[in-house]
Each structure stands twice: as C-alpha cells, then as structure tokens.
Amino acid sequence: NGQKIFGMVDSGEDWDYPDGSDPRYPLRSGITTSTGYDDEVLSYLDSLGVTSDNLQFYVATHPHSDHIGTGDTIVRLYSPDRVYLLPYDDSYIYNTARLWDNLYVYDQLLTAVEETEGVTLIQHLNPGAASAEEGSPDFAFGNFQIQIVNYEEDYLTSPKEDANQFCLGVIASANDHRAFLTSDIDDVEGDASRIVSNYGLYSIDLMTSNHHGY
C-alpha cells in the first residue's frame, strides 16, 4: 500500500553505563564509558521516517552494549510491535572477564519493553509456532521473508565463554536475493559453519561481516 515499514537488528552503543553503585551492575574493566551513538541513531531513524506506528520489530542479537545499548531508547521512542531478546543472566557466562555491563543493558532493555504499551516481548523462538507474535523465527516483512537464526538455548544450562556464543542472526530474502546479518556470531563452537550449512548460505548477495572475522 506504499506505506513505509521498518525493522531493526541491533542499534549500537549508548552513553549510559553502570556507575557501580548497584552491586548487580559493577563498573567493570572494559565497559565503554566514553562513546555513544544515541543522537546519530535517532537522527538517522527520524530521517527515514521511523515512528511508533511503523517499526514492526527490533532484534536484540545479544547483550553487549555496542549492539543493544541504545535498545531501551529505541523501544521507548518508537515502540516496536515485537522485541526479540533471548533470556540472559551473568551466570550464563563462565569467563567473568567477559561480563562487562551485559546484565545492565539487558535489564534496561527488558524494563523498557515491560513499560512500553503495545510491545510484545519474544524471548523463546520456536519453529513450530503459528505466528511471529507466538515466537516463530520465520515471518513475512513486506516483500521480505525474515529468518532469525542461532536461537538455540543450550547456553541456559551450559554456560559459554562469551555472549557472542548465543548471538542471534538474521537472514532477509526477497526477489531471489538474500542478505545475512551476522551480528557477532562466531565459529568458536561451530555456530557460523552450522548456519551456513543449514541455511545454504554458500552464495548470498549481501553479508554484514562481524568484527570477529568469521
């Protein structure tokens, strides 16, 4: 019908960080405290015409601030129809040097979703679900077909070294073309190789290469 619709996969670092006053959120070494892209992200979305009426989904790939730090602001300002956010707790990471402000950004996004009217939180993806609202990882988005991948939840009972090992990815397909948004999926446990094999991604038209080089 010619109306714009939008979806987002991550949204970048923000200026917010824990000050250490809350014992749940220590000010750990490695937490980003001097960089944020709130203004740039919001300005770009506004320039595209994103509003609270046309943002259909926000995929929070994993709880690292350089990916979802601005997520709570996005939710509060643009109230996406659905937010995809896998469960997180610091106990899911066995390498304490990689906890950073993971729980802080996760809890902030979760709170924003809970406090924003009309936003559906999806924390568990199920290929047998009847609709996107019920947790299907595959859904139509305008002329696109979206597939959310790497949503297995083994990390809930078998802790990982880093949240990158339970990081969502997104495949977008339209008009016989495909794009793969990798986020921070790596191959430490074979995730990248498995996804390429399972989804036939040996030949694609566009890939956002993550900063881990896999």
Write out the residue ranges for each language-model feature.
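Acidic/His-rich, metal-assisted hydrolase cores and their charged scaffolds
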Residues: 82, 117-122, 129-136, 166, ...
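Active-site HxH/HxHxD metal-binding segment of metal-dependent hydrolases
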Residues: 57, 65-113
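Short, well-ordered coil/turn elements that cap or connect secondary structure elements
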Residues: 2, 78, 115-116, 141-143, ...
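Metallo-beta-lactamase
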Residues: 90-165
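A structural micro-motif
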Residues: 78-81, 119-120, 144, 177
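Active-site-proximal loop/helix segments of hydrolase catalytic cores
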Residues: 1-50, 59-76, 149-214
